[in-house]
A protein has these predicted regions:
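Conserved signal-transmission helix
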Residues: 65-71
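Helix-boundary and loop/linker segments of multi-pass membrane transporters
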Residues: 74-78
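Membrane-cytosol interface motif
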Residues: 47-62, 153-167
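Hydrophobic alpha-helical transmembrane segments of small proteolipidic membrane proteins, enriched
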Residues: 1-59, 79-150
């Protein structure tokens, strides 16, 4: 292996620990986001039965400050979804990186006939990508449902402003 190849290999191996840590953090965050989402879904369901605004963040924000424009409410919605949107996009990338980094040592172990080392490297690689994809799937789903909720809330605010009351 040339010195340039060794340098590239060495640098890539330095990223394994931080990337695995990032995948674990994103995985944990995804379940935090799922819990917050389920709580909001419960609040919205209960609010529908009771006729309150609980769980309807944009409607609550508008009720507190009726001078908020549609653009400001939309910015609030985007801010509320931002972290989960980032996780849904970054987690698969980090999962791919976490898969590729151990592949080099796994292939080297295969070439050297060290099947136990190869197995360990592949276990790390595939475990990381699985966790990353689960994190991405959870956050993707929560973002898309919230996007619909916020669109409904914005529509309700617009109807309220124009006096058009629809069910």
């Amino acid at each position: 292996m040339s010195s340039l190849e060794q340098l590239l290999y060495g640098i890539s191996q330095l990223f394994l620990g931080p990337v695995l840590l990032a995948v674990l953090i994103l995985f944990g965050y995804a379940f935090h986001a799922l819990g917050a989402f389920l709580m909001q879904a419960h609040q919205r369901s209960r609010a529908r039965r009771l006729g309150s605004l609980e769980g309807h963040e944009l409607l609550l924000a508008h009720a507190r400050d009726t001078s908020l424009t549609d653009d400001e409410l939309e910015a609030l919605a985007l801010k509320r979804m931002e972290r989960a949107r980032i996780v849904s996009r970054v987690a698969p990338m980090l999962g791919l990186v976490a898969t590729m980094i151990p592949m080099g040592p796994a292939l080297q172990s295969l070439a050297d006939g060290q099947f136990a080392d190869m197995s360990r490297s592949l276990t790390v690689a595939f475990s990381a990508v699985i966790l990353a994809l689960i994190a991405a799937a959870i956050t993707y789903a929560t973002v898309h449902v919230r996007r619909r909720w916020y669109a409904q809330d914005l529509l309700a605010v617009q109807r309220k402003r124009t006096g058009d009351v629809q069910p």
